[in-house]
């Protein structure tokens, strides 16, 4: 167990947590089951200055290890934007990452950095879905910067999807065009396995 963490240059005592907790029963106990798909949601930082989420990441990594290696389940993770989970190796047992980017230089650079960090933790397949595509020039921008083998497809910019998000609705139910594009991306994922 670890009960000490560093804060700046000072040490402080914190609630201890196990590095290898038994989590085999948690997915079945805690998951929401929707049409045969189980959903687990990890919390987030609720208040500024509340400290790191190290215990939560230890728990998440243990749950993922259990699901991937012991159960041989299919796991899809929607990780928060950023690189911290790569530094922690939270998703190191995944077969591949799918990075959602937009047609901009910083977004492409984020993909490049994710690909580098993923390789460091043993994940060699990093695929791309290009989102908020307005026209052919956006598609060409993406194609000129992303290797063809990594590019899964495009999702068009859609006011309908934005309106659905503002209303708290699923774009899945509101935008048949986006749904068709997502189905094409799924077919591309299946074809590249």
Q: What role is predicted for each listed range?
A:
Residues 41-42, 99-102, 128-131:
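Conserved beta-strand segments of the P-loop GTPase G domain that flank and frequently precede/overlap
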Residues 4, 31-32, 66-70, 90-92, ...:
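Conserved catalytic network of the ASCE P-loop NTPase/AAA+ motor domain
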Residues 62-71, 86-105:
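Inter-motif core of Ras-like GTPase G domains
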Residues 14-42:
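Alpha-helix-centered segments that form part of catalytic cores
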Residues 119-193:
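C-terminal lobe/tail of nucleotide-utilizing enzymes
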Residues 42-48, 52-53, 64-86:
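Switch II (G3) loop of P-loop NTPases
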Residues 2-7, 12-13:
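Single conserved hydrophobic/aromatic residue that forms the stacking wall/gate
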Residues 45-47, 81-82, 104-106, 133-136, ...:
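Conserved nucleotide-binding/hydrolysis micro-motifs of P-loop NTPases
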């Amino acid at each position: 167990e670890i009960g000490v963490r560093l804060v700046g240059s000072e040490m402080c005592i914190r609630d201890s947590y196990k590095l290898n907790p038994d989590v085999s029963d948690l997915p079945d106990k805690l998951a929401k089951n929707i049409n045969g798909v189980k959903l687990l949601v990890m919390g987030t930082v609720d208040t500024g200055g509340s400290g790191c989420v190290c215990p939560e990441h230890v728990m998440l990594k243990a749950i993922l290890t259990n699901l991937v290696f012991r159960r041989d389940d299919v796991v899809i993770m929607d990780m928060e934007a950023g690189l911290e989970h790569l530094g922690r190796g939270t998703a190191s047992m995944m077969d591949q990452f799918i990075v959602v980017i937009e047609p901009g230089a910083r977004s492409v650079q984020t993909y490049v950095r994710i690909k580098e960090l993923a390789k460091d933790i043993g994940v060699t397949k990093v695929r791309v879905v290009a989102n908020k595509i307005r026209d052919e020039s956006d598609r060409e921008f993406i194609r000129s910067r992303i290797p063809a083998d990594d590019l899964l497809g495009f999702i068009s910019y859609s006011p309908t999807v934005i309106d659905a998000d503002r209303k708290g609705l699923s774009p899945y139910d509101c935008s048949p065009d986006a749904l068709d594009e997502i189905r094409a991306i799924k077919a591309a994922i299946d074809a590249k396995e």
